[in-house]
Regions:
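C-terminal binding/interaction regions
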Residues: 1-55, 60-77, 82-159
Length: 159
């Protein structure tokens, strides 16, 4: 188990100094799901919700979330992201939208939080777009699938 790096000697929160870290290519992929009713899935597929195209809006929201992650998560650094790709897969059994975000940069710290934030905000946006027809949607299973680059090495989830 690694040590916690976001605390100073007094045990108080700090932003880690990354000045001396090597610049490397970083990539992280995160995923999550939002479970919806069959009726809501029909609306998503047919584009019949009053707020507009659910997946198009969620895609832009996820991209924006990754870009602004450092403003939301206190100890995250602002990063020069070089790529953000949000994809969706629709499933009818069970009814859900699967969300995946891949984020890349060349920098001194990883992009895991950016990928996780992108998935989270995309799911929240789907909820917002669909809440007029369903209130009991469930956002589930948000997780890091993989990361590469950096001192701690590569990671791949074991599913």
């Amino acid at each position: 188990m690694g040590e916690l790096t976001h605390f100073n000697k007094q045990g108080r929160a700090r932003m880690v100094d990354v000045t001396e870290k090597a610049v490397t290519h970083r990539r992280a992929v995160a995923a999550g799901e939002i479970r919806v009713s069959p009726e809501t899935m029909v609306h998503i597929k047919n584009g019949t919700l009053k707020k507009g195209d659910v997946l198009a809006v969620a895609q832009v929201a996820g991209i924006q979330a990754a870009k602004h992650n450092w403003e939301l998560i206190p100890m995250c650094h602002p990063l020069p992201l070089t790529g953000i790709d949000i994809t969706f897969a629709l499933s009818d059994s069970p009814c859900m939208v699967e969300i995946q975000a891949a984020v890349t940069c060349t920098g001194v710290t990883g992009v895991e939080m950016e990928a996780l934030t992108a998935v989270s905000v995309a799911a929240l946006t789907i909820y917002d777009m669909c809440k007029a027809v369903q209130k009991d949607m469930r956002i589930e299973n948000i997780r890091l699938l993989s990361k590469s680059g950096g001192k701690s090495g590569d990671y791949q989830i074991k599913e």
